[in-house]
A protein has these predicted regions:
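Generic structural signal for secondary-structure transition and capping sites
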Residues: 2-6, 117, 164
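Non-catalytic DNA-recognition/assembly elements of restriction-modification systems
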Residues: 1-11, 15-19, 149
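Short beta-strand/loop turn elements enriched in aromatics
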Residues: 15-36
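A generic structural signal for alpha-helix starts
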Residues: 103, 116, 147-150
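Short, recurring structural edge motifs at helix starts
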Residues: 46-49, 128-130, 139-149, 165
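Specificity-determining recognition surfaces
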Residues: 11, 32, 76, 91, ...
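A short beta-sheet element
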Residues: 22-26, 39-113
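Amphipathic alpha-helical segments
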Residues: 108, 142-167
Length: 167
């Protein structure tokens, strides 16, 4: 999967033909699970962009990782949920992933943002003023999970419940 390289200036907050997940929003605005039906996302204005990234249209369960930050929040991610008919693309300074195996909604979003997983990313980060992580470095990480979709669902629902209590 591919991300686009559109800056904020190339996007619109009002109208467009596709939604765009920007790394700054992943780092600050969005939680572990991004319900695209509830969040207002910046819009892509240029229709030619869609043809170039057609194979990378996001789906429910995809994960968007912010690959750049000014600190060790690099690697924060949002799992895509609530997607219906909209076209959504992964934006500048993000790495989109589509799981090969089926996961329960929310499980990957919460797990990949856990300290247990993030500890693997810290030695892979590069940079001094601006920190980043590469796709190739991400391949050196391990995802630990139960094969039971029911158990994954319970874990995801538990953390979602806690999120709602806090907010």
């Amino acid at each position: 999967m591919q991300n686009n390289t559109l800056s904020r200036a190339d996007l619109s907050n009002e109208t467009g033909i596709a939604k765009n997940v920007h790394y700054g929003d992943v780092l600050i605005k969005f939680g572990d699970v991004l319900d695209v039906s509830r969040e207002q996302l910046p819009m892509i204005k240029d229709e030619k962009i869609l043809d170039k990234y057609k194979a990378s249209f996001l789906q429910n369960g995809d994960v968007i990782i912010a690959d750049t930050a000014e600190d060790t929040t690099v690697g924060k991610c949002s799992e895509i949920a609530g997607l219906r008919d909209e076209v959504v693309l992964s934006g500048l300074h993000t790495i989109p992933y589509r799981p090969v195996e089926k996961f329960a909604t929310g499980y990957l979003g919460y797990y990949l943002n856990s300290s247990a997983f993030h500890k693997q990313l810290i030695p892979l980060m590069q940079g001094i003023k601006v920190t980043s992580i590469s796709k190739s470095a991400m391949q050196d990480t391990d995802i630990i999970y139960t094969k039971s979709l029911e158990e994954q669902g319970k874990i995801g629902n538990f953390f979602q419940f806690i999120d709602h209590l806090i907010t």
